[in-house]
Structure formats: C-alpha cells, structure tokens
C-alpha cells in the first residue's frame, strides 16, 4: 500500500509538471484567447492563427484534457471546457499562471542552490537571484517592470490574498450593538469593506483612511465633496452618506480620536522585512496612544499569519505554506506566525498605566488572514478581556 501511494505521488508530481509546462505554452501562444467560447475550432486553423505547430498543439490539448482543461470533441477539433474557458476569460488567471511558470518555478528549483549562501536574509541573495542571475531584488524588479508587478499581484490574489477574506472576517463580528458609532478603517486600499458594512449596519459612520501613495485607490467615479467640519476629509456621494475618505500614511498620528472601533490593515509582518515591521510598530503605537485616552475603543488589526500545523483544512494549509515558500524563494522573507504578531504588540511602548493586549483572534475560513482584536488594558488591572466588542 505504501509503495502504491508513493508511486501515485510521484506520478501526480510528473503530471502536474507537464500540465504547468502546457499551460505556459498555451499562454505564450495565445491559444486560450484565440479559441472562441462555446464552439469547436479546427486544430489546423487554430495552429495557423497562433503560429504554432499543429502537431504540438494537438499533443498539448490531449495532455491538458486529462485535467479537464480543453477538449477534443472529435479528431482535428478543439473546444473549451468550463475550466479552460475561465482561464481564457480571466486575464488575472492567465497572468498568475505565467508568473507561476516563468518566475516561481525557476526560483523554486534554485532553492537548494541557496544552501551554499548560508543563513542569509538578504533580499538580493534569494533563489530568485540565482535563477535569473541578477543582483536586483525581486521587489525592485517589480517596481521597474509593470508587467511583472501585475503578474505578481495576480498570483497573490489567486492564492488567497483577497479583500473578500477581510470582509468575510469583519462581517462575523458583532457590529449591531455599536449604534451610531464611528468606525475608522486605516491602511485601506478602497472603500469596498466600508460599503459592505454600511449596507448591513446603516447607522454606523465610517472614516476610510487611504495611505498617501494609494489615495486614488477608492472609487473615483463617486461624487466627492469636502466635509468642512473635518479638514482633509472628502465624502462620498449620497448613496453612501455615512462613509468619508481621508489620506493618512501608516505610522502617523491618528487624527480621529472618538471612534468606537479602529480597523487596521497591516503590511507584511515578515521578520526579514525590517522597514515594514518598523511601520507596523509605529502604527500600533499611534493607536495605543488613542486607546489609552479612549479605553472603551477596540482595535482590530488584520494581517496574514500562518496557521498552526494541522489547525485548518489540509488544502487551506497547503496554500498558506505555498505562499510562505514563494516569499522565501523570491525575497528571502516568510509569512509570519501568531508569535511574530505578539512580538510586535509587545514592542509597543506602554502608554500611561496600560498597554495593548490581544483579546481575541478570528481567522478567515480559507487563507492566511487573521483579525486580531486588541484592547487597552491597565497594567495594574490584569484579567480576562471580552472576546468581542
């Protein structure tokens, strides 16, 4: 039985390698885009249209068909399946697949070659640098190559880095009892989550704080008018009268002092990413200062954190570990664990007679996202904290 299982594992591995090679070939040759949805197409005509070998195209289709990707309804004809049609109609999936084959796979296969470098956290000494014989870090390459950056973002989104996960976690919290309270969302990339919560709880007021470089990330189609009573804030149109937007860079003082809940979307907590961790500590410090004067308020910090081994469904954990290895191979960073977040909280200087403490943790159902519920607690009054608002 063990021999059979090991043989099956190896054969599945070989199959997936060739599937990825075929998907890369289909992506580069534009076959998926040129093949119309809902009807078959001649192999010969499609090969001529895409400028590829008819024989190779036929062989590629017959292999991917074993995974339900493309089909040969009759000899000499090719047709989309629902799976391949989804790839053909979604540029994000195509970008993610090309990134997987063109960047991640070569980098992953150089991981063992980094052994001779010893224990290094330098972003310029990663498996990616060895694979592409470059001293430029992966993140620098993304900054100067828009296509690479687009594909990287597509890969992240298709491996679980979705705003939907944050929204799903936040909607599980008890907002109803807050009445007409103010909710601040800091480090946001859009007003999407505020709009969802506003529809569910129309009495709540929201202030969405976008970081400076991302200040145009919200829906610019909305009609925006200044709110005279709060300088620097613009308000959305009449469809969302309780949502305001302002610009605020992470780490700066929090200008809204009377909110009931502060939602904070944190950047990477990777131990190797020192600048990012420094910003996180400053941001936690800024909100600790607010909570020390408003101890009834709650801080909800969202971050990507690895689940403890075996604590979630195997497929979910597998994708979390895949993202962790991807970071290691491309940047020498890694996804943090809960203990890493606890270390950052402990690095925040105590304010007055108290400090920040984690009262609860909520994990997304299908990925790395965790919402940490933090409260301000006086050092002289330890004890159990409520697990919700």
Swiss-Prot record:
GO MF term list: DNA binding
Stated name of the protein: Geodin cluster transcriptional coactivator gedD
Residue ranges of domain HTH iclR-type in the record: 13-83
Domain of life: Eukaryota
Entry's localization field: Nucleus
Residue spans binding DNA: 43-62
PANTHER family named among the record's database cross-references: MONODICTYPHENONE CLUSTER TRANSCRIPTIONAL COACTIVATOR MDPA, PUTATIVE (AFU_ORTHOLOGUE AFUA_4G14580)-RELATED
């Amino acid at each position: 039985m063990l021999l059979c299982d090991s043989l099956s594992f190896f054969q599945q591995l070989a199959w997936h390698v060739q599937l990825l090679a075929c998907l890369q070939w289909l992506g580069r040759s534009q076959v998926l885009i040129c093949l119309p949805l809902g009807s078959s197409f001649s192999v010969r005509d499609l090969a001529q249209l895409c400028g590829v070998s008819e024989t190779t195209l036929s062989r590629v289709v017959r292999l991917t068909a074993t995974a339900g990707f493309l089909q040969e309804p009759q000899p000499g004809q090719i047709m989309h399946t629902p799976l391949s049609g989804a790839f053909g109609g979604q540029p994000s999936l195509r970008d993610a697949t090309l990134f997987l084959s063109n960047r991640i796979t070569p980098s992953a296969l150089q991981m063992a070659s980094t052994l001779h470098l010893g224990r290094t956290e330098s972003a310029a000494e990663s498996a990616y640098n060895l694979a592409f014989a470059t001293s430029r870090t992966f993140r620098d390459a993304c900054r100067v190559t828009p296509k690479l950056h687009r594909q990287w973002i597509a890969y992240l989104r298709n491996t679980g880095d979705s705003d939907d996960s944050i929204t799903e976690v936040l909607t599980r919290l008890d907002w109803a009892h807050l009445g007409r309270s103010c909710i601040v969302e800091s480090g946001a990339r859009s007003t999407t989550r505020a709009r969802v919560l506003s529809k569910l709880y129309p009495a709540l007021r929201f202030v969405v704080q976008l970081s400076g470089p991302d200040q145009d990330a919200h829906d610019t189609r909305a009609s925006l008018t200044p709110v005279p009573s709060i300088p620097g804030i613009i308000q959305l149109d009449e469809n969302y009268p309780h949502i305001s937007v302002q610009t605020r860079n992470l780490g700066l003082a929090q200008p809204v002092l009377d909110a009931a809940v502060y939602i904070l979307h944190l950047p990477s907590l990777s131990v190797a990413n020192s600048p990012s961790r420094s910003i996180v500590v400053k941001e936690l410090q800024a909100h600790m200062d607010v909570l020390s004067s408003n101890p009834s308020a709650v801080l909800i910090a969202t971050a990507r954190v690895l689940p403890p081994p075996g604590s979630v469904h195997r497929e979910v954990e597998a994708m979390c570990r895949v993202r962790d290895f991807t970071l290691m191979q491309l940047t020498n960073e890694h996804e943090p664990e809960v203990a890493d977040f606890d270390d950052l909280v402990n690095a925040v200087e105590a304010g007055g007679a108290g400090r920040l403490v984690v009262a609860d943790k909520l994990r997304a159902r299908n990925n790395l996202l965790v919402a940490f519920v933090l409260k301000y607690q006086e050092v002289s009054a330890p004890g159990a904290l409520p697990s919700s608002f």
